[in-house]
Each structure stands twice: as structure tokens, then as C-alpha cells.
């Protein structure tokens, strides 16, 4: 009985194995489904990649705009820095030039006092006494005149000019009015008398002339 069962089982094994073997049609269908799934994933990935460029392009445009603004701002700052540097250079140069021109201003003011004394001394010498029979006074007067002429040459050499504006129009920047008086034959507003001469150093009033001004009668 047992032997008969064994023989029956051996006859049934090939048929059972054949029934368990996978069907080619099923394998093909499974393969197609698998490939379809892969293709779908690839298509979705490609779609996402195609959707990325617009976002990247927008980002690049924003970066470009930002960089252009930064460049413009940097250029403006550079231009302002250049302008400030040039202004500073010009101011420094002007200060140096003014120092050269007006550095002797205080010294000149002191020398003006000496020039005033020489002028007064020359004016005080009685002209009628200057004769050959009075050689001492004559020599003294000539010495004073020569000294005054020489000091005026030195003043001119260094840009210091005398202001003796008799008959000129009154200028408040160069003259200081001590009094106003009507003078016949003189135009009102002009200088009638110079009490003390003034001086200008390189065009700048160092000391105004003290004057009397003509006014209407």
C-alpha cells in the first residue's frame, strides 16, 4: 500500500511542477508594469527638472538686479570719494598758497609803523630850510627820502602796495571814513583827505586808509 502511494506521487510531480511554473504572459505583464512605473518616475523627474529652470532664471535675474544696484552704489560712492579728495586737495593747495602770500602779514604790519615814522619825519622837515648853506639838514632830509623810497621798493617786491586814495571813490573795503564834510568843487562820495595811508598785501587790504569823505553841501 505504501509503495503504491509513492509510485502515485512520483507520477503526479511533473504535472505539479508544470502547474507551478510561471506563465510567460504573466512575466511579460509584470515586466511591463515595472517598466511603466520606472518610466513614470523618470517622466515625473524630467517634468520637475523642466519646471526648475524658470525658478533658477528668476533667481539669477534677481541676483543680477541686486549686483547692478550694488555696482551703481559703489560707483557713486567712488565718485563722491574722488570729488571729496579733489576738493580737499584744492583746499590744501589754496591754504599753502595763502600761507606763502600772507605768511608775512604780521611782519608787514610791524614794518608799516616804521614806514609811517619815516613818512612823518620827511614831512616834518621844513622845505624852506633845505639849502646848500645848511648841509646837515639837507643831507638828513635826502637820507630820509632815500630810506623811504627804498622801503617802498621792498614793500612792492613782496606785494605790499600803498593806498593813497585822494580824489578816488570811497571804498569801504579799502578806506575808513574818519569824517564827512562838504568840499566845494569835489564830488560827493569821493575822498577829500587822507589822514593815514593804507596798504594792501597781494590784493588783500592789510590796513585801510584813514580818510575824510566829501558829502553834499
Swiss-Prot record:
Modified residues (N6-acetyllysine): 94, 100, 215
Biased composition (Polar residues): 30-39
Primary localization: mitochondrion
Transmembrane residue ranges: none
Gene Ontology CC annotation, any one: PAM complex, Tim23 associated import motor
Pfam families listed in its UniProt record: GrpE (PF01025)
PROSITE patterns listed in its UniProt record: GRPE (PS01071)
Subcellular location: Mitochondrion matrix
Subunit structure: Probable component of the PAM complex at least composed of a mitochondrial HSP70 protein, GRPEL1 or GRPEL2, TIMM44, TIMM16/PAM16 and TIMM14/DNAJC19. Binds to HSP70, HSC70 and HSJ1B.
Family classification: Belongs to the GrpE family.
UniProt protein name: GrpE protein homolog 1, mitochondrial
Amino acid at each position: 500500500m505504501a509503495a503504491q502511494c509513492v509510485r502515485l506521487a512520483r507520477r503526479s510531480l511533473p504535472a505539479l511542477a508544470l502547474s507551478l511554473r510561471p506563465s510567460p504572459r504573466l512575466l511579460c505583464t509584470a515586466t511591463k508594469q515595472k517598466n511603466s512605473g520606472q518610466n513614470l518616475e523618470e517622466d515625473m523627474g524630467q517634468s520637475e527638472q523642466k519646471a526648475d529652470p524658470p525658478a533658477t532664471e528668476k533667481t539669477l535675474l534677481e541676483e543680477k538686479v541686486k549686483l547692478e544696484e550694488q555696482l551703481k552704489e559703489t560707483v557713486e560712492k567712488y565718485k563722491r570719494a574722488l570729488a571729496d579728495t579733489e576738493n580737499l586737495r584744492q583746499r590744501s593747495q589754496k591754504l599753502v598758497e595763502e600761507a606763502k602770500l600772507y605768511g608775512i602779514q604780521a611782519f608787514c604790519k610791524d614794518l608799516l609803523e616804521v614806514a609811517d615814522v619815516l613818512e612823518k619825519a620827511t614831512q616834518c622837515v621844513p622845505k624852506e630850510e633845505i639849502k646848500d648853506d645848511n648841509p646837515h639838514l639837507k643831507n638828513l632830509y635826502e637820507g630820509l627820502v632815500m630810506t623811504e623810497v627804498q622801503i617802498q621798493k621792498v614793500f612792492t617786491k613782496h606785494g605790499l602796495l600803498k593806498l593813497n586814495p585822494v580824489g578816488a571813490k570811497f571804498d569801504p573795503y579799502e578806506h575808513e571814513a574818519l569824517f564827512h564834510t562838504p568840499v566845494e568843487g569835489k564830488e560827493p562820495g569821493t575822498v577829500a583827505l587822507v589822514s593815514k595811508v593804507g596798504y594792501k598785501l597781494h590784493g588783500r587790504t592789510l590796513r585801510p586808509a584813514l580818510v575824510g569823505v566829501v558829502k553834499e553841501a
